[in-house]
UniProtKB/Swiss-Prot annotation:
The record marks H28, H261 as: Important for catalytic activity. Thiamine diphosphate binds at H68, G115, P116, L117, G157, N186, H261, F436. It comes from Staphylococcus aureus (strain N315). Gene3D superfamilies: 3.40.50.920, 3.40.50.970. This is Transketolase. GO terms for molecular function: metal ion binding; transketolase activity. The gene is tkt.
Amino acid sequence: MFNEKDQLAVDTLRALSIDTIEKANSGHPGLPMGAAPMAYTLWTRHLNFNPQSKDYFNRDRFVLSAGHGSALLYSLLHVSGSLELEELKQFRQWGSKTPGHPEYRHTDGVEVTTGPLGQGFAMSVGLALAEDHLAGKFNKEGYNVVDHYTYVLASDGDLMEGISHEAASFAGHNKLSKLVVLYDSNDISLDGELNKAFSENTKARFEAYGWNYLLVKDGNDLEEIDKAITTAKSQEGPTIIEVKTTIGFGSPNKAGTNGVHGAPLGEVERKLTFENYGLDPEKRFNVSEEVYEIFQNTMLKRANEDESQWNSLLEKYAETYPELAEEFKLAISGKLPKNYKDELPRFELGHNGASRADSGTVIQAISKTVPSFFGGSADLAGSNKSNVNDATDYSSETPEGKNVWFGVREFAMGAAVNGMAAHGGLHPYGATFFVFSDYLKPALRLSSIMGLNATFIFTHDSIAVGEDGPTHEPIEQLAGLRAIPNMNVIRPADGNETRVAWEVALESESTPTSLVLTRQNLPVLDVPEDVVEEGVRKGAYTVYGSEETPEFLLLASGSEVSLAVEAAKDLEKQGKSVRVVSMPNWNAFEQQSEEYKESVIPSSVTKRVAIEMASPLGWHKYVGTAGKVIAIDGFGASAPGDLVVEKYGFTKENILNQVMSL
């Protein structure tokens, strides 16, 4: 039963959120004031999260998908002992632990970075997917070593975003029973009344996806909220609980209006609101000891007991299933097996394969040595070569399966991969055509902001796609991805560069990787293995030509590298000194020492030509004012791939002409 102390705690969370925003003179008080009861009920009665043991693997995950309500999350983290009160006073200030929207790895207790609406919801599907897969893989009768929930607090805006439709469809199809969404249904959006833009039947929508739907008519009724969460945890399939709330609850002049969504209440309205709560408006950032004690005696006590029981269970599990236990411990550590490279292929001279196919070969090898390797494609596995051969598909019936069928849901796939990476225990990946990377670009950006070990496979990387035409031929995508900070964008030139690219992807603990791969075949370059290994890791290196300072530099990535080598050989026949540089990863190259960069691209050599079947954006930094860029300023065309490539000037003859014109 709930009592007056519980109501005091709820109102304290509201007041803390208000004061946090007032001091910053910036923020969104409406959601915290309306949603505090459901958050309080969840945290004190259900959530297994221990601020004193934040890395406890079997903890429940809480995601504030409506990231603009961050003041509520920070207030919860404070009263539960995870965040100092001083940090609330520094909300949205330089160097604080309380940024405007929650940030993963910045504030303890934040599971994923949220703010762009819909993505938190979709990443939560990834969190629940990770739990389901790991449970299916490691749990044995009497030993549920993976057994936790993912709880989401979502807003109207989250459910309007297209990604929520993709993610909800996927979650329902896969019966992710450990996913519970609390929907803060307050009928107000930033611009005004919600019914001006949003009138769908939430119950019908989610039941059509295969979700359970529950309704709490009064968002201040702690008992009803508690009952709904309890019911949700006992049902098969994901559950959404629509909780009807009043935005800005307690504010006499702003409650129920968009005026309280994204602006401080102001001093006068704050005073009136505190009086409505029965709190002293003269006291700021005030938390009574009895509120702290509530969290100590409920949430923290429960979490400590849960972790203690889990540790004991894990010890017994290790005795009964020693090999599985070792694999589990390695998985949750995030580390790779020491022998993970043992099965990786070496591609010999004379091998001629598309980098997507060579990547597929690498994937088969990784799956044998990295048990935590898990992912799939957005309905293009046959083209992306991304499935693990002879492996079981992931499904609600076979959650231990390795191949995920994401369906044509690119954005949700990207967010789900991020969620899986943030969850831990997996090295996740997702795959689609490169031109469709635009569909999941915001997820790539969040992956980079969070610094996740996530891999994105993008195949069919250029106009060489051919017949499908300009809608399916990437042009501006490469420059767009390279512009994302903290993103490894690797476009390998052959099978061996592809192998090392995968090594980089798996080993990059705080940088996501985009692998950009060809449809067409590429010859293996005549470069020693150790040179390829070091060169790809450093982002650029010499693959052909003069070790001395050359007269000409040919710079390229991916499929154009072998073309540059052909041109270089002809130039050498004409007595010219040429060096060909493969530049698979600009991000890595820019992190190298000036000495290394100078050794690869000598500043004294001004006669430079860059060759890439994509937008020229970015290449001028490397070719300089005296150099030239053979690239594409328009869109592609529909015709056989070889003909399209020729028509756009990616021929040995054109390269020679451009070089000789310098």
